[in-house]
């Protein structure tokens, strides 16, 4: 996996502005209405969840062009890059699809750079191509998988870098490239560039492994809320559906040959319905 340098990325976008990355029908909001979320504006309440499609800048840009405005960025953890023992590509689809992905296939610093590049590119594109409000989209970071890892220096630097990217080398590189290429834009000047917010994300989605104890999830959420000051989502694992329900659904759909036991269902969070 090879990230595209920001200058090359922007040159590509400016050349292919009518069909960037092969997207021939570029979305533009027809209304000036928006939602308010985390004290930010959101033009459209939809977008990609964390996955392989939100780990490279060009994937995020393509999703924006197709209409996405809320982006759950690919999850990061302390185990990253070549140290991550997962077969690539992460998703194998033949008849049924086996999703063996974990966290980002990049290193954590590389992931941070990709998200900053994507943010800056969208700020330029939305203004230059009149694709909607430059502040009409939201980036939501995603971290995992235990408190020790999330509190590590590596993940802390990632979180702080997205809370405010102004001190990162890639942010300054994006600014300098844009300043030196103002002639390539019709509707962007230096005043606009200096007004681009370096506060990329004020929210986080917590991703935990199957079997993570409820009290560990609570400790992580408390840390993210109180110590990091982030609006926090907790991602619910599909084992909450229960073994019997999951087994029945798969059998009914013709996947009765898929084999799995009750282990993760029994040791993961349990869903209890309270009738009032």
Feature annotation, model-predicted:
Residues 187-201, 205, 246-266:
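A solvent-exposed, charged loop/short amphipathic helix patch at secondary-structure junctions
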Residues 207-213, 235-237, 264-271:
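Catalytic beta/alpha-barrel core
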Residues 1-227:
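N-terminal capping/small domains of soluble enzymes
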Residues 236-240, 257-259:
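Non-catalytic helical/linker scaffolds that mediate oligomerization, partner binding
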Residues 72, 233-235:
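Conserved beta-strand positions in the central sheet of alpha/beta enzyme cores
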Residues 274-276:
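Conserved small/polar residues in nucleotide/adenosyl-binding loops
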Residues 212-218, 240-245, 272:
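Active-site-adjacent beta->alpha loops and helix N-cap segments on the catalytic face
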């Amino acid at each position: 996996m090879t990230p595209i340098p920001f200058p090359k990325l922007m040159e590509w976008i400016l050349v292919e502005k009518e069909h960037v990355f092969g997207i021939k029908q570029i979305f533009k909001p027809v209304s000036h209405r928006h939602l308010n979320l985390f004290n930010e504006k959101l033009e459209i309440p939809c977008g990609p969840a964390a996955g392989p499609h939100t780990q490279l800048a060009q994937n995020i840009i393509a999703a924006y062009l197709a209409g996405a405005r809320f982006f759950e960025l690919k999850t990061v953890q302390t185990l990253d890059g070549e140290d991550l023992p997962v077969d690539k590509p992460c998703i194998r689809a033949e008849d049924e699809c086996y999703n063996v992905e974990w966290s980002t296939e990049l290193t954590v610093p590389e992931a941070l750079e990709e998200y900053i590049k994507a943010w800056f590119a969208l700020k330029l594109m939305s203004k230059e191509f009149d694709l909607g409000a430059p502040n009409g989209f939201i980036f939501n970071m995603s971290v995992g998988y235990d408190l020790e890892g999330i509190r590590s220096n590596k993940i802390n630097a990632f979180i702080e870098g997205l809370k405010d990217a102004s001190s990162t080398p890639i942010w300054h590189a994006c600014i300098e490239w844009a300043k030196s290429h103002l002639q390539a834009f019709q509707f962007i000047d230096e005043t606009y560039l200096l007004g681009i917010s370096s506060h990329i994300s004020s929210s986080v989605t917590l991703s935990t492994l199957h079997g993570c104890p409820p009290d560990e999830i609570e400790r992580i959420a408390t840390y993210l809320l109180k110590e990091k000051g982030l609006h926090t989502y907790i991602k619910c694992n599909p084992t909450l559906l229960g073994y019997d329900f999951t087994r029945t659904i798969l059998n009914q759909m013709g996947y009765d040959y898929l084999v799995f036991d009750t282990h993760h269902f029994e040791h993961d969070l349990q869903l209890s319905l309270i009738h009032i």
